[in-house]
């Protein structure tokens, strides 16, 4: 693969070992503290998560972590992330994974600055007017979540799976 950059309006950075640039890239967007969101063990076993952490450490950006995002992400993980972001004063999300991880990070990003229940956005009770920035180290480019403002979350109580469009 040839390395290249595509911007539309999301900045996409393509190429081998580009995860090593993560720290420099998020620093460019003003990150002061990041929450890394990831799913299961593949990002750990492959060494990807360690390379991303090293990149952040090299530029001095502190971070906290939220793992265990599952396919068809659930609201309880979003609530957990919102609480942790507020406690840790996070100002940028970094999703390391595929669509479910990205959707979770986006939902958390919308929920952190909101004083109500983030689910209000999904049921049309509120509109997202402010959100944390979201960066992505993509592992599975299947859902398209990395290039859209949409996010799909399942509410465990009642098993509602709803989409929020244009965060």
Residue spans for each PLM region:
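Conserved beta-strand segments of alpha/beta enzyme cores
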Residues: 11, 62-64, 133
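N-terminal small/polar loop signature for handling phosphorylated ligands or for N-terminal nucleophile
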Residues: 44-116, 125
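N-terminal amphipathic/basic leader segments beginning at the initiator methionine
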Residues: 1-29
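A glycine/threonine-rich phosphate-anchoring loop and its flanking beta-alpha core
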Residues: 113-165
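Conserved beta-strand elements of the Class I
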Residues: 35-36, 92-94, 135
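Cofactor-binding loop segments of dinucleotide-utilizing enzymes, especially the Rossmann-like FAD-
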Residues: 38-40, 68, 137-139
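Hydrophobic anchor at the start of a short beta-strand
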Residues: 33-34, 63
């Amino acid at each position: 693969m040839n390395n290249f950059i595509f911007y539309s309006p999301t900045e996409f950075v393509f190429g081998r070992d580009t995860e090593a640039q993560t720290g420099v890239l998020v620093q460019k967007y003003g990150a002061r503290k990041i929450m890394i969101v990831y799913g299961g063990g593949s990002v750990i076993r492959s060494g990807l998560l360690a390379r991303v952490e090293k990149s952040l450490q090299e530029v001095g950006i502190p971070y906290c972590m939220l793992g265990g995002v599952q396919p068809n992400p659930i609201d309880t993980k979003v609530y957990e992330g919102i609480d942790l972001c507020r406690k840790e004063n996070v100002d940028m999300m970094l999703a390391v994974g595929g669509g479910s991880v990205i959707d979770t990070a986006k939902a958390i990003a919308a929920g952190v600055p909101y004083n109500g229940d983030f689910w209000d956005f999904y049921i049309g009770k509120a509109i997202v007017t402010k959100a944390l920035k979201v960066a992505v180290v993509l592992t599975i480019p299947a859902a398209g979540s990395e290039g859209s403002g949409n996010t799909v979350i399942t509410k465990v109580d009642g098993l509602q799976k709803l989409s929020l469009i244009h965060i």
